[in-house]
Amino acid sequence: MFRGATLVNLDSKGRLAVPTRHREKLNEESAGLMVCTIDLHQPCLLLYPLPAWEIIEQKLSRLSSMNPAERRVQRLLLGHASECQMDGAGRILLAPTLRQHAGLSKEVMLVGQFNKFELWDEQTWYQQVKDDIDAELSAELPLTDRLQDLSL
């Protein structure tokens, strides 16, 4: 399970160093092989260890290519999916098209989300956190039954 938000730097070649605390688990789970794709609802990227991504691919393969909405999701997720191999220094290379989609520059937030990471431009991340907190405080959105039962 991946958790926590860490500021990492993107180098001039488009590589980012995975924090040391995650490297061992990624090497155990996937020999350092990951898949990066776009998020359909947020200006960020999703980075999965290969076994977790393969589960997503199986679900996508069950969607109908004849249904326009399902085909659109397949096209966006699979069409942007890019394999990333962690090198000996713990770095992964992000494709230019993916970096552009998320507006990534030098400073990137690597955010653990259970079985994957989100990759955010640092300033966009902080704005998203602010917006999320503001939405919670204003109670604009009704709580789902699951959220009402969640005790922290």
Swiss-Prot record:
Keywords, comma-separated and alphabetical:
Cytoplasm, DNA-binding, Repeat, Repressor, Transcription, Transcription regulation
The transmembrane segments are none
What is the annotated localization of this protein? Cytoplasm, Nucleoid
Name the Pfam families on file: MraZ
Q: Which GO terms describe its biological process?
A: negative regulation of DNA-templated transcription initiation
The primary location reported for this protein is: cytoplasm
Q: Is Ribonucleoprotein a UniProt keyword of this protein?
A: no
Single annotated GO MF: transcription cis-regulatory region binding
Tell me where on the tree of life, at the top rank, the source sits: Bacteria
Q: What are the record's GO terms for cellular component?
A: cytoplasm; nucleoid
Q: What SUPFAM superfamilies does the entry give?
A: AbrB/MazE/MraZ-like (SSF89447)
The SpoVT-AbrB domain sits at 5-52, 81-124
Q: What binding partners and quaternary form does the record give?
A: Forms oligomers.
Q: What does this protein do?
A: Negatively regulates its own expression and that of the subsequent genes in the proximal part of the division and cell wall (dcw) gene cluster. Acts by binding directly to DNA. May also regulate the expression of genes outside the dcw cluster.
Q: Which family does it belong to?
A: Belongs to the MraZ family.
Which named protein is this? Transcriptional regulator MraZ
Upper lineage ranks? Bacteria, Pseudomonadati, Pseudomonadota, Gammaproteobacteria, Enterobacterales
